[in-house]
């Protein structure tokens, strides 16, 4: 599992309507090893991870099977797999917060065929233990198609700094956006700015994510 502290792959957007802000933030902060900077980029941390067990692929990516792809690959079937969920802070209705996105499309990554069946399952609401914002947020996580890593997202706060004042976001609505990512080897083969821009393309919600 990757972590921000080991691989510096955490990224965030700030009022982001495209990938530019996330890419700029990532590139400008990539070599900043100060504790405060790491804290800002790891804004939301909760010990509430639950791993959804699914069968693993038998064949893994390798140099011999990998083919060159552009950054647009990160947004394959973007319209089908980026799901915006507006959650009312005062009404955590499981029927509204539980979503499955299943696609029968067959795609090829690294010359390995697989059928896409993306499971997106929000977990129970968790409370931020920061005095600047005590509102409930939902933690969400899901496996990538290649089952090689997970992504976690915490959404709904427009203030980057953990020591800052009250956030400017809506007090009642928390927006979630889920991202479909390519395999780890594809992400690793691209420049950080390119990868981040691709991963955050078409964002309309402020989001903070860790690639674990």
Curated annotation (Swiss-Prot):
Residues 87-107 are annotated as: Disordered. Present with 656 molecules/cell in log phase SD medium. Residues 87-105 have a biased composition (Low complexity). GO terms for cellular component: cytoplasm; nucleus. This is Uncharacterized protein YML053C. It comes from Saccharomyces cerevisiae (strain ATCC 204508 / S288c) (Baker's yeast).
């Amino acid at each position: 599992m990757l972590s921000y502290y080991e691989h510096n792959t955490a990224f965030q957007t700030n009022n982001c309507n495209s990938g530019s802000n996330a890419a700029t933030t990532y590139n400008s902060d990539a070599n900043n090893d100060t504790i405060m900077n790491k804290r800002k980029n790891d804004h939301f941390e909760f010990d509430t991870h639950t791993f959804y067990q699914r069968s693993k692929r038998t064949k893994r990516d390798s140099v011999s099977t990998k083919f060159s792809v552009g950054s647009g690959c990160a947004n394959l079937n973007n319209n089908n797999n980026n799901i915006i969920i507006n959650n009312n802070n005062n009404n955590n209705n499981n029927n509204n917060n539980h979503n499955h996105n299943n696609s029968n499309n067959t795609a090829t990554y690294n010359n390995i065929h697989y059928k896409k069946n993306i499971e997106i399952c929000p977990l129970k609401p968790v409370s931020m233990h920061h005095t600047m914002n005590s509102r409930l947020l939902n933690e969400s996580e899901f496996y990538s198609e290649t089952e090689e890593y997970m992504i976690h997202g915490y959404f709904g706060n427009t203030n980057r700094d953990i020591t800052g004042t009250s956030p400017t976001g809506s007090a009642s609505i928390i927006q979630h956006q889920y991202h479909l990512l390519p395999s780890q080897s594809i992400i690793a083969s691209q420049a950080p700015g390119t990868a981040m821009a691709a991963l955050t393309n078409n964002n309309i919600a402020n989001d903070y994510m860790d690639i674990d």
